[in-house]
UniProtKB/Swiss-Prot annotation:
PROSITE patterns: RIBOSOMAL_S9. The lineage of its organism: Bacteria, Pseudomonadati, Campylobacterota, Epsilonproteobacteria, Campylobacterales. HAMAP family: Ribosomal_uS9_B. This is Small ribosomal subunit protein uS9. The keyword Ribosomal protein applies. Pfam families: Ribosomal_S9. It comes from Wolinella succinogenes (strain ATCC 29543 / DSM 1740 / CCUG 13145 / JCM 31913 / LMG 7466 / NCTC 11488 / FDC 602W) (Vibrio succinogenes). GO terms for biological process: translation. Belongs to the universal ribosomal protein uS9 family.
Length: 129
């Protein structure tokens, strides 16, 4: 089977994911997942969630490149990309991943700053006198 390509997004982070049948290696930006995260278990579980749900953690190799955003947003973008790649790999996985919301793009992004305001919604301090 050929390589399967998918992209995942979250906030301003983008993850490009290539999935191939293999032994379960997961490479992010040229390093292993543990090195990339610095041993952060909660974020690691978030990234591994689609693989664990479909029981593919030992049967596919994943190579990915992430850019933009912070670690948490990159991890969620990576999870989104892995989910999309798995659903392209086997259509049966779609029925497992879709109810968990892993194929849905989280559209929440930072609200823009408005003129006359200090931030998106914070107004300057009001003085009555």
């Amino acid at each position: 089977m050929a390589k399967i390509y998918a992209t995942g997004k979250r906030k301003t982070a983008i993850a490009k994911v290539w999935l191939t049948p293999g032994s379960g290696k997961l490479t992010v930006n040229g390093t292993t997942l543990n090195d990339w995260l610095g041993g952060h278990e909660a974020i690691k579980m978030k990234v591994m969630q689609p693989l664990l749900l479909t029981k593919q953690e030992k049967s596919v190799d994943i190579v990915s490149v992430t850019l933009g955003g912070g670690y948490s947003a990159q991890a969620e973008a990576l999870r989104h990309g892995i989910s999309k790649a798995l659903s392209a790999y086997d259509i049966a996985f779609r029925a497992i991943l879709k109810p968990k919301g892993l194929l849905t793009r989280d559209s929440r992004v930072v609200e823009r700053k408005k003129y006359g305001k200090r931030k998106a919604r914070r107004s300057p301090q009001f003085s009555k006198r």
